[in-house]
Regions:
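Hydrophobic/aromatic beta-strand patches that form the interior of the parallel beta-sheet core
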Residues: 116-118, 148-150, 196, 258, ...
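Short, small/acidic-rich helices and loops at N termini and domain boundaries
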Residues: 1-81
Length: 340
């Protein structure tokens, strides 16, 4: 008969199919069962709307009977916490070494996945700080790191000049006088440095850059000016969202992200700084950082022709090795180099 032929065709087709794995079959059956229970819940709700059922007892009975079927069974791949694995990870924590001796004595270095927040008042030397770390002697670029600098405050060429100063150890005037010397010092590190002026961009664009160019070091100057998108009730919530996004980029694309920030007016002329001085933020930004460095300088002394070159780097958060305190160094503003 036609019905018999139909069954024969169906069974022949089933015979050809590849059987589902045990886990997949279990999941499919579980989903179907949950749908059946959902239909029963909907029927009870419909009866209550129509006044046919005024008690929750039937619904409570369903929940007690089938609750375990809606709690998924997990298959988690737990972290390897053997001593060999832990010590190997510790060895990778400082892949890129700091080139400021006073900092290096306290913090070995950084690695992919780290979010480093750097804060300072205007005219303290934020841009020179990352230029010195990357392009200065024994900096990240010298160590072979692929470095990308995204700047949305200063013009890209001006930021590039700081990198030229730091790499060559020469002022603008000295470079003009001895261009060949500057070029020979700058060329080896410039191959590992890319700078992009990017006003008006958001964190989604930053993530696209990280995905496309795979940097080892990614500098956001200024981090707070890259919008994270969305609507926020308070400015500090928006800044927290930016920091969270930056941290996700660091972890997802295995790069060290330097997140440059302004400090509030409270930090003006101060040498000892703390997390609460981050402009516009409460604790949201600080909570995301692996390392937070706040750069202070003493107020200008009346009658002095030039401000002091001394800079005070406050290590106010440090998940890398736990050391907190202040290290001192000098900034040569002509060569954009931090040193001792």
């Amino acid at each position: 008969t036609a019905q018999k032929q139909g069954y024969a065709s169906l069974f022949a087709q089933i015979k050809k199919e590849t059987p589902l794995g045990g886990d997949v079959a279990q999941e499919v059956l579980s989903k179907l069962f949950q749908r059946v229970v959902g239909e029963k819940v909907a029927e009870l709700g419909f009866d209550m709307v129509n006044g046919d059922n005024r008690s929750l007892e039937a619904l409570r009975g369903l929940m007690e009977k089938y609750n375990d079927d809606f709690i998924p069974n997990m298959n988690i791949e737990w972290e390897d916490i053997s001593i060999e694995s832990i010590m190997a990870a510790v060895g990778e924590e400082a892949r890129w070494k700091f080139n400021i001796p006073s900092v290096m004595r306290k913090i070995d270095g950084i690695s992919g996945g780290h979010l480093i927040e750097v804060g300072a008042r205007p005219n303290v030397g934020k841009t020179s700080f990352h230029a010195s770390l990357i392009a200065g002697p024994n900096g990240f670029a010298h160590q072979g790191a692929n470095c990308i600098i995204l700047c949305n405050e200063e013009a890209g060429k001006r930021v590039g000049e700081r990198y030229l100063n730091a790499a060559s150890g020469m002022s603008r005037y000295e470079i003009g006088v001895n261009f060949q010397k500057a070029s020979s010092a700058y060329y080896p590190v410039s191959k590992n440095i890319r700078i992009k002026e990017c006003q008006g961009r958001d964190m989604a664009w930053v993530e696209s850059v990280a995905k496309s160019y795979k940097p080892d070091i990614l500098v956001l100057d200024m981090g707070d000016k890259f919008s994270a998108g969305g609507n926020y009730a308070r400015p500090d919530e928006a800044l927290k969202a930016c920091a969270i996004y930056a941290r996700q980029i660091a972890k997802t694309y295995d790069c060290a992200v330097f997140y440059m920030s302004q400090l509030s007016a409270e930090a003006e002329g101060r040498t000892t700084l703390n997390q609460s001085m981050m402009e516009g933020s409460r604790t949201g930004k600080a909570a995301e950082a692996d390392l937070m460095l706040l750069i202070g300088k003493a107020p200008h002394v009346e009658g002095e022709e030039q401000e002091s070159p001394l800079r005070h780097i406050n290590v106010v958060k440090n998940k890398l090795n736990g050391w907190h305190g202040m290290v001192n160094c000098d900034l040569d503003y002509l060569t954009a180099r931090y040193g001792v």
